[in-house]
């Protein structure tokens, strides 16, 4: 993948490298559409690279782990007591903590690079074929910008329902400049997101270009990705009919992965992945990588010593016949025994469970990985240093998004049908007959379980306004006491927006 990276800016001069020695002039980069496509490819590389000289800061994967999962209610990081503030989201109330600063930096880097491409896109060319190429380039850049503002909004702004879009939004940069700007409203933020996506969809449709059909090119943005971004953005905005429309369009060319594909390690795109973060051994970020923090098979200590573990509260509502459960080391009651004797978050060093996991999961964990109850082996590295692609959008998410929108509109039969479509590939006997609040809880339970580790947990809690409840072993859960939470405050009232 050819790469050209530009300098970046958000709200202050600290984000802008004014005269980098390796800079290439706009005249060279944007000499023609073929050259400009390399710059668009560079946007994909920005999503997986080292940031701020800090391990764990890798771009998109950092957002999924540090904001999406660790502060949520689905995954705990083994017995890593030093991460209590991260796991409890305490850094959300700090204006100086790098864990919240890095996400702002990363997405505005994407936005600035997208803006530099958009500022230089050609229009009105007499050469129709060349103009179509430029339209394709512009459409891709618009998708990256819209996606970046969507992700920034769900982290740094309050929920849409808190003030119907009148609350503080973001700094909306649509050109390459570093001038001071006020924050927009949330409504203005989503007006720009929708505008960018509408234009991108129109350009993708009219230009006649698409990314290659090879699954290893799923890191490239296309029409389907534009619809997927629209689906997620509309979900945040509570724009239910728009969610339904774009969820259906986004997944039109994709199908739910098979049980074998689901258990294959989530490190390579397949028939279900709509968009991905690309990474392999030719472009590794080593110990900075997502897999070094969300896998149990990487040789890094953050993976081996403190592997991710799914919460018992997430597993318990799922039918035991579901084949997806096989990627988690779920103990039997006999293997656990007296819960009062369980150490911390469930570390095990000997006995039947330990021996079973070492044998059954031998190909899914590193040889010296510490064993825990409910150990997650969803993400398996391609190589020991942490290489592997990451799904940004899957067809399943689009179906859960649509189901949530259908529920909000009172279309319960549609919700039941969508749930059955997502679950039956893994449990042929699954039938959903629930209604009302029970149906809502069923939908949330399967969304949490299916999208586990993929960066959705905290964002979902915030959107739903759900309390954070992490039960200890004594309370029927599997959380260590130092990670446990009984926060009855709704998700819309905690997070960076409060600061």
Regions found by a protein language model. Give the residues of each.
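Membrane-proximal, proline-rich intrinsically disordered regions
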Residues: 11-65, 247, 314, 318-320, ...
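Inward-facing hydrophobic residues that define packing positions of alpha-helical scaffold repeats
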Residues: 111-114, 190, 197, 247, ...
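Hydrophobic-face positions in mid-chain alpha helices that act as interaction patches
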Residues: 38, 244-391, 395, 450, ...
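Conserved, well-structured interaction surfaces
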Residues: 80-155, 184, 202-204, 384-390, ...
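Aromatic-residue-lined binding/catalytic grooves and analogous aromatic/hydrophobic interfacial grooves
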Residues: 12-13, 204, 223-261
């Amino acid at each position: 993948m050819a790469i050209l990276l530009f300098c970046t800016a958000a709200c202050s001069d600290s984000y802008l490298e004014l005269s980098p020695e390796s800079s290439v002039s706009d005249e060279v980069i944007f000499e023609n559409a073929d050259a400009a496509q390399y710059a668009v490819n560079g946007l994909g590389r920005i999503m997986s690279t080292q940031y701020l000289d800090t391990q764990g800061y890798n771009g998109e994967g950092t957002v999924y782990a540090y904001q999406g999962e660790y502060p949520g209610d689905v995954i705990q990081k083994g017995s890593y007591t030093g991460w209590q503030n991260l796991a409890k989201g305490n850094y959300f109330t700090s204006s100086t903590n790098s864990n919240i600063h890095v996400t702002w930096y990363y997405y505005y880097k994407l936005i600035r690079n997208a803006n530099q491409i958009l500022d230089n896109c050609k229009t009105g060319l007499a050469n129709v074929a060349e103009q179509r190429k430029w339209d394709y380039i512009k459409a891709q850049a618009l998708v990256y910008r819209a996606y970046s503002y969507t992700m920034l909004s769900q982290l740094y702004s309050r929920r849409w329902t808190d003030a119907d879009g009148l609350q503080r939004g973001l700094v909306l940069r649509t050109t390459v400049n570093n001038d001071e700007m006020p924050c927009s409203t949330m409504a203005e933020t989503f007006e720009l997101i929708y505008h960018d996506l509408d234009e991108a969809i129109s350009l993708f449709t009219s230009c006649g270009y698409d990314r290659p059909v090879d699954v290893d090119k799923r890191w490239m943005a296309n029409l389907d990705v534009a619809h997927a971004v629209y689906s997620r953005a509309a979900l945040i905005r509570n724009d239910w009919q728009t969610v339904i429309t774009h969820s259906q369009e986004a997944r039109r060319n994709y199908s739910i992965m098979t049980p074998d594909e689901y258990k294959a390690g989530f490190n390579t795109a397949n028939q279900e992945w709509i968009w991905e973060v690309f990474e392999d051994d030719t472009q590794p970020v080593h110990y900075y990588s997502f897999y070094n923090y969300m896998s149990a098979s990487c040789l890094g200590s953050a993976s081996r010593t403190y592997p991710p573990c799914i919460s018992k509260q997430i597993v318990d509502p799922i039918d035991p016949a579901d084949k997806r459960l096989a990627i988690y080391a779920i103990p039997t009651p006999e293997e656990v025994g007296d819960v009062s004797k369980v150490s911390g978050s469930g570390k095990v060093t000997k006995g039947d469970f330990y021996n079973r996991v070492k044998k059954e999961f031998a190909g899914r964990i590193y040889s010296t990985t510490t064993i825990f109850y409910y150990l997650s082996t969803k993400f398996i590295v391609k190589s020991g240093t942490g290489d592997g692609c990451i799904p940004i959008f899957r067809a399943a998410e689009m179906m859960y998004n649509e189901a949530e929108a259908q529920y909000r509109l009172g279309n319960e039969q549609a919700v039941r049908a969508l749930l059955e479509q997502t679950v039956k590939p893994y449990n042929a006997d699954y039938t959903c007959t629930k209604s009302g609040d029970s149906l809502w809880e069923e939908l949330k339970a399967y969304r949490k379980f299916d999208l586990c580790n993929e960066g959705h947990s905290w964002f979902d809690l915030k959107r739903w306004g759900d309390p954070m409840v992490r039960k200890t072993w004594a309370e029927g859960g599997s959380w260590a006491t130092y990670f446990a939470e009984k926060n009855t405050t709704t998700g819309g009232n905690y997070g960076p927006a409060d600061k």
